UniProtKB/Swiss-Prot annotation:
UniProt-listed SMART domains: S_TKc
Protein name, per record: Serine/threonine-protein kinase BUR1
Main location: nucleus
Gene name as annotated: BUR1
Species per Swiss-Prot/TrEMBL record: Gibberella zeae (strain ATCC MYA-4620 / CBS 123657 / FGSC 9075 / NRRL 31084 / PH-1) (Wheat head blight fungus)
Domain Protein kinase: 37-339
Length: 539
């Protein structure tokens, strides 16, 4: 066996060579300890973690610490968190959230040594998220401010798509804004690289090249091609989400708030028109369209958004185009004439400052729980009591002018409905109301869990296939995607017989001379007294 050389080609020892060519130790940055931060309060809780406001003790800088929740510790570190960390370390853009540090919280007591350390992601603290701002009744968006936010959102999206990254969960709650007017795209737990060309000016995205999971994007921001189970999708799915966010900023609340997959498609057809070979070619060939026969309708987007001007309507129609192959891309959307119309967009530093507004602050503003259906967990199917998500916040037969940013203002109405029971009130954009009481179900909270999901296939009319389980009555409870135990659908045993468990009942029976299984009758039976050999019963 040949002996390895003890020197490098230039005559130095391997150790000396390594020391001469090594990076300085100051260039390596490991993970901080959670004790390096002072926790200041909880900002929110999502599918994959909690977010806390904190201050770095060394510099005093405010950060957001995202606690990565280990739902199934035996499975190891969540793949979604690994993917998010990897992508955030690769990206660098003013409109993309930056990952600044990772922090570790080790078990403190000797008895907790078997527990795994808790990992936190540290990002710059942002004063608001767009969903929280839209729910803040003291905030009123004007057109120049909406244009400023839309330009920043499209700039960030163009950078992502130029980097061949799909976000796959574009929604208002994932858009962070600070009091300097800067908007940043956050939450890359569902993001991934995609195979395909990057967007070009004047060139539609066309067809996708490979299959991806369809269990992505929160329902209210989900494009029709995903609802119809297209697997070879493109960056056009993110553009649809931007269109939903744009309409939400104009109107003041989500414009496509469906209660289930089928309902989501129905309100999309109401807004954009029924699919046909002109506006959505070959839509019938999609797996989820086999049994669909939507009633003919022309769409009412122009009527509903007419008050916001022809430019806004034109951009919204391009962003929400049913045909994903010809849907506008971020490059062309940035050049849309609406941004050059009066009033012109504000500069970020010209946008007014607001009190801190995050998705969790909905309870502070309106004393209600979060309205959004939870984001799907990529690649898995969730089951749980909230399979149909939240109720719709948009009536397709109602003009958009009554939204909070519309001509009539007042997103949250007070009226005679406030004195009705919860199950009789009109549904808003919040949680589903409590069902009415009935004789067959004395306490609806005691119902068993829903049936477990079956294998993939044609969906029923009101079954949602991607909403993970949450107990909305207990917001601190972790999600559980494991299927529920088998449900026994047999009716309960009858309990309508009178039970003689008391001494008084037995005494009452004896006094009335009723028959009893536990003792002989006190008096002779008439048929026995008539017998010739009768001597009488003796006790």
């Amino acid at each position: 066996m040949e002996k390895l050389s003890e020197t490098t080609p230039n005559g130095t020892s391997p150790r000396t060579f390594a020391l001469n060519h090594s990076r300085p130790r100051s260039s390596f940055k490991g993970c901080s300890r959670i004790s390096d931060y002072e926790l200041l309060g909880k900002l929110g809780e999502g599918t994959f973690g909690e977010v806390h406001r904190a201050r770095l003790r060394k510099t005093g800088a405010l950060v957001a610490l995202k606690k990565i929740i280990m739902h199934h510790e035996k499975d190891g570190f969540p793949i979604t968190a690994l993917r998010e960390i990897k992508l955030l370390k690769l990206l660098s853009h003013k409109n993309i959230l930056r990952l600044e540090d990772m922090a570790i919280e080790h078990p403190t007591r000797q008895t907790d040594k078997r527990k795994k350390p808790i990992v936190y992601m540290a990002t710059p603290y942002m004063d608001h998220d767009l969903s929280g701002l839209l729910d803040n009744p003291s905030v009123q968006f004007k057109e120049p401010q909406i244009k400023c936010y839309m330009l920043q959102l499209l700039e960030g999206l163009r950078y992502l798509h130029d980097s061949r990254i799909l976000h796959r969960d574009m929604k208002a709650a994932n858009l962070l804004i600070n009091n300097k007017g800067i908007l940043q795209i956050a939450d890359f737990g569902l993001a991934r690289h995609y195979d395909g060309r990057t967007p070009e000016s004047g060139v539609p995205m066309g067809e996708g090249k490979r299959d991806y999971t369809g269990l992505v994007v929160t329902r209210w921001y989900r494009p029709p091609e995903l609802l119809l189970q297209l697997r070879q999708y493109t960056p056009a799915i993110d553009v649809w989400g931007v269109g939903c966010v744009f309409g939400e900023m104009l109107y003041g609340k989500p414009i496509l708030a469906g209660e289930s997959d089928a309902a989501q498609l129905d309100i999309i057809w109401d807004l954009m028109g029924s699919p046909n070979e002109e506006n959505m070619p070959r839509w019938k060939s999609l797996p989820g369209a086999d049994h669909l026969t939507p009633r003919p309708r022309t769409g009412n987007l122009e009527t509903r958004f007419r008050q916001y001007g022809s430019g806004a309507v034109s951009l919204l129609k391009e962003l929400l185009r049913l045909d994903w192959r010809t849907r506008i891309n971020a490059v062309d959307a940035l050049q849309h004439p609406w941004f050059k119309m009066q009033p012109l967009p504000l500069e970020p530093h010209e946008i007014p400052t607001y009190e801190e507004s995050h998705e969790l602050d909905r309870r502070k503003f309106h004393d209600r729980k979060a309205a959004l259906p939870p984001a799907p967990k990529g690649g898995t199917v969730g089951v749980g009591p909230d399979a149909n998500g939240a109720t719709a916040g948009f009536n397709s037969n109602e003009p958009y002018g009554n939204g909070r940013n519309g001509v009539n203002g007042g997103r949250y109405r007070n009226g005679p409905d406030d004195r009705r029971p919860a199950w009789q009130r009109e549904r808003g954009a919040g949680l589903p109301p409590r069902p009415p009481p009935n004789n067959d179900d004395a306490d609806f909270r005691e119902r068993g869990p829903p049936r477990a999901r079956g294998p993939p296939g044609p969906r029923g009319p009101d079954v949602d296939t991607y909403i993970p389980a949450y107990n909305r009555d207990d917001p601190g409870r972790r999600r559980d995607d494991r299927p529920p135990p088998p449900r026994d659908d047999r009716p309960p045993p009858r309990d309508d017989r009178r039970r003689r468990n008391s001494r008084e009942d037995r005494r009452f029976d004896r006094d009335r001379g009723t028959m009893s299984r536990s003792r002989s009758p006190r008096h002779d039976r008439s048929r026995d007294r008539d017998r010739p050999d009768h001597n009488g019963y003796r006790r």
